[in-house]
């Protein structure tokens, strides 16, 4: 696919699609709650539609209208054995959180996914769940999907110190803890996104959060809710960077989620001298959201490491692109988690942007980016990773001559089916 190139002046306002993390969880909590849950501004992209499909297979009635998703909750105990394996496609969130949800059920389940899922590490979820009494294993006894879960296991409380900073692992343990006897205590390594914790409260449950320590009691019941999912800050990030690096641009992004565990990119943009303003922030059905305005800016290199990394882990590919247009060197470290995403994002970012003229050195846990470098035409690939594909389209906007051909552009539909249309809507 030929990408859009040689564009100046991205001007206008868009509303990015609903938050992917929250869309997944809204279906999950709607299913394990009792009564009806109504979800608006749900992300209708491949990953989240896969979560709907999985819960339908588990016997949950889910209706889809143009405006809403309506989940008729069954409670944990109302989930039924699927007729066959649950195929969750490309969604790491779905497989890992479902492992926690299904660990305490009284039926057996097999969960599988695409070739990318089959390469992603699952011991980080399986080991703590096994410690709680769950019985599960990967293919041929490995840690890789398909994952087989044996039902009718009695889950017990535990105290767990997380070896990695991962919201997916934390959430899987929380879902299992809700079905366990007693109180489970989780100690996070670093603060990660906390949508699961907030949704427990939104759906009428109880959870204690004190710094990096989380306490959750088993045996809780949830009640269906009405909710509006805010725009995904990870999707907004591509337009934030486009507005900062494309000459003559000013972009307004409306109804963007502003959960502080997700807004690390705002801090980095300001560190680099970028013009980013948040206005009209408000709480819509308990979720903080607002309008983000960015303008073309002169940028300088910076260092990105430590506890900010979990707050922007999914944005690092497009932050790396931003750094190619900043004066000086940008160093990103403590981000080894990027190697076990949909692809090895450290290598993918360096390889593809270097093809276009960037000066990026991959490291064991991050990237060293020397700016400012002009970008030129090249043939590039998404590696089947939605965030790499979208980042390369933003990079292509700066290419003045020739074509940028993207292999596997369809990956973008995992999280942002209307991405290319929204880019075109901002062109003068």
Curated annotation (Swiss-Prot):
Catalytic residues in the record: 314
Recorded GO MF terms: 3-phosphoshikimate 1-carboxyvinyltransferase activity
Subcellular location: Cytoplasm
Reactions listed under catalytic activity: 3-phosphoshikimate + phosphoenolpyruvate = 5-O-(1-carboxyvinyl)-3-phosphoshikimate + phosphate
Taxonomy, superkingdom: Bacteria
Binding positions for 3-phosphoshikimate per the UniProt entry: 20-21, 25, 166, 168, 314, 341
InterPro entries, A to Z: Enolpyruvate_Tfrase_dom (IPR001986), Enolpyruvate_Tfrase_sf (IPR036968), EPSP_synthase (IPR006264), EPSP_synthase_CS (IPR023193), RNA3'P_cycl/enolpyr_Trfase_a/b (IPR013792)
Pathway(s) of this molecule: Metabolic intermediate biosynthesis; chorismate biosynthesis; chorismate from D-erythrose 4-phosphate and phosphoenolpyruvate: step 6/7
SUPFAM superfamilies assigned to the protein according to its UniProt record, in alphabetical order: EPT/RTPC-like
EC number: 2.5.1.19
Binding site for phosphoenolpyruvate: 20, 92, 120, 168, 345, 387
GO cellular component: cytoplasm
Function statement: Catalyzes the transfer of the enolpyruvyl moiety of phosphoenolpyruvate (PEP) to the 5-hydroxyl of shikimate-3-phosphate (S3P) to produce enolpyruvyl shikimate-3-phosphate and inorganic phosphate.
UniProt record similarity statement: Belongs to the EPSP synthase family.
HAMAP family reported for this sequence: EPSP_synth
NCBIfam families: aroA
Complex formation: Monomer.
Protein name: 3-phosphoshikimate 1-carboxyvinyltransferase
Organism from which the protein derives: Listeria monocytogenes serovar 1/2a (strain ATCC BAA-679 / EGD-e)
């Amino acid at each position: 696919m030929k990408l859009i190139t040689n564009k100046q002046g991205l001007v206008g306002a868009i509303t990015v699609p609903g938050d992917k993390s929250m869309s997944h969880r809204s279906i999950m909590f709607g299913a394990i709650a009792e009564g009806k849950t109504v979800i608006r501004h749900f992300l209708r992209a491949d990953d989240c539609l896969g979560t709907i499909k999985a819960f339908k297979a588990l016997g949950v009635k889910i209706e889809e209208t143009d405006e809403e998703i309506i989940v008729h909750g069954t409670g944990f105990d109302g989930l039924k054995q699927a007729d066959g394996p649950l195929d969750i496609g490309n969604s790491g969130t779905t497989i890992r959180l479902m492992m926690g949800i299904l660990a305490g059920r009284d039926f057996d389940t097999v969960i599988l996914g695409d070739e990318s899922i089959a390469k992603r590490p699952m011991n980080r979820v399986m080991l703590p769940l096994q410690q709680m009494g769950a019985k599960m294993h990967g293919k041929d006894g490995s840690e890789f999907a398909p994952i087989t879960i044996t039902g009718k296991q009695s889950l017990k409380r535990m105290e767990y110190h997380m070896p990695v900073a991962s919201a997916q692992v934390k959430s899987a343990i929380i879902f299992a803890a809700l079905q366990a006897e007693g109180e489970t205590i989780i100690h996070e390594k670093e603060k990660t996104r906390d949508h699961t914790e907030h949704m427990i409260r939104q759906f009428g449950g109880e959870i204690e959060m004190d710094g990096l320590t989380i306490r959750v009691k088993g045996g809780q019941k949830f009640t269906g809710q009405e909710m509006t999912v805010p725009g995904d800050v990870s999707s907004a990030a591509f337009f934030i960077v486009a507005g900062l690096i494309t000459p003559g641009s000013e972009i307004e992004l409306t109804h963007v989620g502003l959960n502080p565990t997700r807004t690390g990119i705002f801090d980095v943009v300001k560190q680099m001298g970028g013009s980013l303003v948040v206005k009209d922030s408000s709480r819509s059905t308990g979720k903080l959201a607002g309008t983000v305005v960015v303008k073309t800016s002169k940028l300088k290199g910076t260092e990105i490491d430590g506890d900010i990394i979990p707050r922007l882990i999914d944005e690092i590919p497009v932050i790396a692109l931003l750094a190619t247009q900043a004066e000086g060197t940008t160093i990103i470290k403590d981000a080894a988690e990027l190697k076990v995403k949909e692809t090895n994002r450290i290598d993918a970012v360096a390889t593809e942007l270097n093809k276009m003229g960037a000066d990026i050195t991959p490291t064991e846990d991050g990237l060293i980016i020397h700016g400012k470098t002009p970008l030129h035409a090249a043939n590039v690939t998404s590696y089947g990773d939605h965030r790499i594909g979208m980042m390369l389209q933003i990079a292509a906007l700066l290419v003045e001559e020739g074509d940028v051909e993207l292999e596997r552009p369809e990956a973008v539909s995992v999280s942002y089916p209307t991405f290319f249309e929204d880019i075109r809507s901002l062109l003068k």
